[in-house]
């Protein structure tokens, strides 16, 4: 998409504002809105200056100036703003060099794609993430010196079977772990998801399906088609934006927290991926599960670096409340065809062109640019160093006896473990200057503040366990 096309969109749709969007280190989209009349030739060459010191984990106040460089190919109409507004995604550049800022997630993703091409291994990596989310009616939480609490409510929640409502309790709701695929009225989110799909398609995503997920209280998923890595990361941000805003329009509140409910399934973001060169799928072959030797080496790299990857794919303290056995959480670092208890699955496909792997431990609070790039770099390290993943595990890993289970490596058990693993195992990420030691150090420092904050806060459960001891 060219400047001319952007200008024609502005004229055709009587656009009044341009919303410049970028993603911070934690994966949250930020934005800056400017009048549409500021868009001209210079705008796409010079960008828009902004204060980078206001973004956590980025610049200090003494060197705060940074450049938002709009990517004209990402222009699309915003479906929610009152005034006609055009969204344009931006890379964050250093003003002195006009090169991608080494801590900018989107620039890191683009450098990873460039590194893939320069390696000669492949020219394209495809990603297909599957973010899950909850829709609640009401969420309240409190954290201050006087105490801490949270409360979740939703008309669909299993705990509301005996709740009195003004117009009566209709009784149709999914029980704990009983939400997968029921028809309405048990599935109360059908129309909300359909609206999400309509808007996602208007914004360029290709929707493949939508459905209720396993958990009670409104766990849902919209499945969208794969794309190249940075484009799919852009689409993941669009996906989250649409989910949260459509929920708001319907009087609901959406969360991508991995584990908001105790005792029911959490939300994951399984990541499907494959490599290709000159249009040929390099993961298709005659090895286990129809994979190529290259694909097996890629899996070997993911398994070898999994705990370091967890720092990007599972970047919150809440992430590790999902990654526990017994809740369809893939904690064991093994691979298998079809077996959903393994952390890496080889899906059944209709043709060899669709051959791919599915990494199942990521969750939807991952920054998609960083999580996708880190997984690619781990896989490429596996290919370069011919890291074989060993034998596949086709048995149900959730039911293994303890003596067998302890022989299988697992993902990190906490955010602190994951951050320490990344600190010790980072070299594979720095190949080709994709990640820098500076960007990794800044990431570690930012997320360690989360670990420390949670560590220092008394938990309500501790009062139940210890108050009268």
Swiss-Prot record:
Cofactor note: Binds 2 Mg(2+) ions per subunit.
EC number(s) stated in the UniProt entry for this protein: 6.3.1.2
Any one Gene Ontology cellular component term annotated for this protein: membrane
Domain of life of the native organism: Bacteria
UniProt activity-regulation remark: The activity of this enzyme could be controlled by adenylation under conditions of abundant glutamine.
Residues reported in the UniProt entry to bind Mg(2+) 1: 130, 270, 358
Binding-site positions, ATP: 208, 272-274, 340, 345, 353
Keywords for this protein: ATP-binding, Cytoplasm, Ligase, Magnesium, Metal-binding, Nucleotide-binding, Phosphoprotein
Cellular localization per UniProt: Cytoplasm
Modification O-AMP-tyrosine occurs at: 398
Cofactor: Mg(2+)
Binding site for L-glutamate: 265-266, 322, 328, 340, 360
SUPFAM superfamilies recorded: Glutamine synthetase, N-terminal domain, Glutamine synthetase/guanido kinase
Enzyme class: ligase
Primary location recorded for the protein, binned into one broad class: cytoplasm
GO BP annotations listed: glutamine biosynthetic process; nitrogen utilization
Residue intervals of the GS beta-grasp domain: 13-97
Gene Ontology molecular function terms on file: ATP binding; glutamine synthetase activity; metal ion binding
Boundaries of every GS catalytic domain copy: 105-469
Keyword Phosphoprotein on entry: yes
Binding site for Mg(2+) 2: 132, 213, 221
Catalysed conversion reaction: L-glutamate + NH4(+) + ATP = L-glutamine + ADP + phosphate + H(+)
Function: Catalyzes the ATP-dependent biosynthesis of glutamine from glutamate and ammonia.
Quaternary structure and interacting proteins, as annotated: Oligomer of 12 subunits arranged in the form of two hexameric ring.
Family membership: Belongs to the glutamine synthetase family.
UniProt name for this protein: Glutamine synthetase
Record gene name: glnA
């Amino acid at each position: 998409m060219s400047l001319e096309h952007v200008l024609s969109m502005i004229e055709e749709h009587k656009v009044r504002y341009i919303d410049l969007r970028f993603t911070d280190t934690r994966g949250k989209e930020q934005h800056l809105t400017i009048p549409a009349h500021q868009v001209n030739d210079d705008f796409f060459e010079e960008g828009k200056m902004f204060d980078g010191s206001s973004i956590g984990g980025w610049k200090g106040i003494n060197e705060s100036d940074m450049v938002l460089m709009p990517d004209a190919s990402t222009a699309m109409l915003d479906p929610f703003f009152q005034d006609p507004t055009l969204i344009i995604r931006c890379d964050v550049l250093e003003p002195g060099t006009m090169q991608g800022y080494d801590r900018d997630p989107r620039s890191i993703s683009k450098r990873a794609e460039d590194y893939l091409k320069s390696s000669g291994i492949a020219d394209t990596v495809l990603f297909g993430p599957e973010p899950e989310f909850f829709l609640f009616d009401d969420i309240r939480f409190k954290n201050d010196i006087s105490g801490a609490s949270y409360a979740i409510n939703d008309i669909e929640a299993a705990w509301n079977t005996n709740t009195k409502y003004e117009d009566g309790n209709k009784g149709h709701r999914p029980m704990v772990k009983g939400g997968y695929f029921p028809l309405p009225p048990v599935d109360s989110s059908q129309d909300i998801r359909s609206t999400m799909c309509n808007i996602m398609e208007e914004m360029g995503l290709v929707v493949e399906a939508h459905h209720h997920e396993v958990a009670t209280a409104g766990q849902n998923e919209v499945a969208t088609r794969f794309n190249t890595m940075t484009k799919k990361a852009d689409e993941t941000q669009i996906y989250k934006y649409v989910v949260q805003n459509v929920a708001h329009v319907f009087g609901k509140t959406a969360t991508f927290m991995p584990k908001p409910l105790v005792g029911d399934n959490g939300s994951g973001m399984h990541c499907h991926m494959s490599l290709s060169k000159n249009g040929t799928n390099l993961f298709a072959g005659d090895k286990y599960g129809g994979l190529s030797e290259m694909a097996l080496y890629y899996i070997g790299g993911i398994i070898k670096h999994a705990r370091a990857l967890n720092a990007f794919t599972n970047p919150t303290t809440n992430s590790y409340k999902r990654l526990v056995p017994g809740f369809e959480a893939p904690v064991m670092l093994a691979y298998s065809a079809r077996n959903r208890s393994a952390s890496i699955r080889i899906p059944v496909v209709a043709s060899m062109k669709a051959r791919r792997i599915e990494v199942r431990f990521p969750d939807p609070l991952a920054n998609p640019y960083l999580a996708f790039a880190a997984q690619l770099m781990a896989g490429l390290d596996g290919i370069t160093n011919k890291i074989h993943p060993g034998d596949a595990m086709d048995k149900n890993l959730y039911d293994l006896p303890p003596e067998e289970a302890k022989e299988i490596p697992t993902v990190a058990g906490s955010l602190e473990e994951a951050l320490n693993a990344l600190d010790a195992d980072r070299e594979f990420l720095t190949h080709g200057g994709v990640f820098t030691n500076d960007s990794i150090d800044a990431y570690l420092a930012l997320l360690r503040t989360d670990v420390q904050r949670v560590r220092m806060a008394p938990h309500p459960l501790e009062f139940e366990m210890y108050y009268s001891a």
